[in-house]
Amino acid sequence: MLEEKNLITNDGIRIAYYDTEESKQPILAVPGIGSTAILWEEVAKLFASDYRFIVIDPRNQGRSQRTFKGQRISRHAADLEELITKLNLKNIIAIGNSMGAANIWAYVSLFGYNRLQAIIDLDQPPKMIRDSSWEYGFKDLTWQNYPDYLKINFGNGIFTHINDEMFKKAKADSGKFRYFAEENYLCRIEHAMQDWRDVLIDLKIPMLVLAGQNSPFFDYHFAFAMEKLNQMISAKIIKNCGHLIQAEQPLSMYKEVMNFLKRI
C-alpha cells in the first residue's frame, strides 16, 4: 500500500518516503528520532480510505541515507519543505511523533502555514528541559545535567504490545538499515534545547495534541498545559499507550484524529 520513493535534497542526501499516491487530501507523517516509517503501517491503513498518506524517513534513520550533515531541526524542516514542494502538497494534515512534531513546528516557523490545514502532535511537549517556566520536561532532564543526560539509552518508549507483523518488519529493517544513536547525538541535543512555545502561542491553524497516558518519557499532563497556550490547540489522552502512539494504539489515534478533523 505504501510505495517507497526517494528524494535527493539540496545538500545531496537521499531521503526515503512512502506514499499511497492517491488524489486525496494528504496526510504527511513524521517519525521521531531513531524511529522508522514502518511503524506507521497500521495507522496508514486506517486513514487510506479517506486520505493520501505519506510518511518520511528523516535523514539518518529508517531507510534514508546516513550522514554527518544536517544534524539540526531546521535542516529536518527544510527536508520536509523539499518533499512538500516536490509532491506539490496542499491542505496538508501534518502528523509528528516525538521529534517529528518539532520538525513540523520548525517547518511552520520557517515556511509558514500556506500548505497546512492542521497539525497533530503525538507525545511531544514544546520544551524538553524542565525549569521554572515549564514543569513537563523529558524525564529528569534539566539545565544542570544537559546535554550529558541525553547520552543515556532510554529505550524505545513503547508501553503496550504492537502489531506482531509490523514489529517483525521494523526489526528486520533495523538490521539492514542500522540506526546509530551516537552518530545522531548532535541532533538529539539540539532537539532537546529547543522551546517551541513562541511558535505555538502564535499558531494560526488547529493543532491536536495526543499524549500517551503511560509514556515513559513525558508526564501526559503536558498536553493540557499546551491547550492553555493557544485556543487553536486541543488535547486528548490515549489510554494504555506509551510514546509511540501511532504504533501502540493506531485505532484510538485514528478515532481521535478523525473526530478532531470533523470539528475544524
Where do the protein language model's features map onto the residues?
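Alpha/beta-hydrolase fold catalytic core
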Residues: 1-27, 49-51, 90, 258-264
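Flexible "cap/lid" loop of the alpha/beta hydrolase fold
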Residues: 105-110, 115-147
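Conserved acidic catalytic loop of the alpha/beta-hydrolase fold
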Residues: 75-92
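Conserved loop-alpha-helix segment in the C-terminal half of the alpha/beta-hydrolase fold
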Residues: 207-241
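Conserved HGGG/HGGXW glycine-rich cap/lid loop of the alpha/beta-hydrolase fold
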Residues: 13-66
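Conserved alpha/beta-hydrolase catalytic His-Asp/Glu region
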Residues: 130-137, 144-202
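Gly/Ala-rich beta-loop-alpha elbow adjacent to hydrolase catalytic centers
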Residues: 96, 100, 104
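Catalytic active-site module of serine/aspartate enzymes centered on a nucleophile-bearing elbow/loop
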Residues: 232-264
